[in-house]
């Protein structure tokens, strides 16, 4: 049996797409940019929130200043609303519990920012023992970088 299993968070342990879409649309609206349907966000996510914002912004508006503005409003909203519609996938908590009971170490490595990753793990999996929960941090490349 494996000694350690490392999971991604968004799209693996948790279905976060609705809260990501709503929060990004909030930020886009606050900055005067067009919003997107939730389904479109499946094409925007992956590689961290900076990439999410770059993909959600109109092509001609993808400057670092605009990404920073969208990020600021996104974090303001998402930090309060990141559990509104987010849910664990079926049987995930059961799987994690079984792994814990068999002595398998469990960790999370996510491109979601660190504070958001920790908050969601604590909120949705309070009874699960994770040996490490790592999200996106300044100065550390996002996955899949080593």
Question: Where is each model-derived feature located?
Answer:
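Active-site neighborhood of HAD-like aspartate-dependent phosphohydrolases
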Residues: 1-43
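Core-facing hydrophobic residues within beta-strands of well-ordered domains
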Residues: 2, 96, 128-131
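Hydrophobic "anchor" residues on beta-strands that sit immediately upstream
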Residues: 4, 107, 132
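Phosphate- and divalent-cation-binding pockets in alpha/beta enzyme and binding domains
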Residues: 23, 52, 91, 116-119
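Helix-loop "lid/cap" segments that line or gate small-molecule binding pockets
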Residues: 27-28, 48-63, 120
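Metal-dependent phosphoesterase signature
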Residues: 31, 55-94, 102-104
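Substrate-recognition "cap/lid" segment bordering the active-site pocket of phosphatases
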Residues: 84-87, 113-146
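Substrate-recognition element of Asp-dependent hydrolases with the DxDx(T/V) motif
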Residues: 95-122
């Amino acid at each position: 049996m494996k000694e350690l299993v490392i999971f991604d968070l968004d799209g693996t342990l948790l279905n976060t797409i609705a809260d990501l879409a709503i929060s990004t649309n909030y930020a886009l609206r606050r900055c005067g940019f067009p919003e997107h349907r939730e389904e479109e966000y499946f094409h925007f996510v992956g590689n961290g929130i900076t990439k999410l914002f770059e993909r959600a912004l109109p092509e001609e508006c993808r400057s670092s200043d605009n990404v920073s503005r969208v990020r600021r409003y996104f974090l303001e909203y998402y930090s309060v609303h990141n559990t509104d519609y987010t849910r664990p996938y079926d049987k995930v908590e059961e799987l994690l519990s079984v792994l814990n009971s068999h002595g398998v170490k469990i960790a999370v490595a996510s491109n979601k920012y660190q504070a958001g990753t920790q908050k969601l793990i604590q909120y949705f999996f309070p009874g699960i023992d994770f040996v490490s929960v790592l999200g996106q941090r300044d100065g550390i490349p996002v996955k899949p970088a080593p």
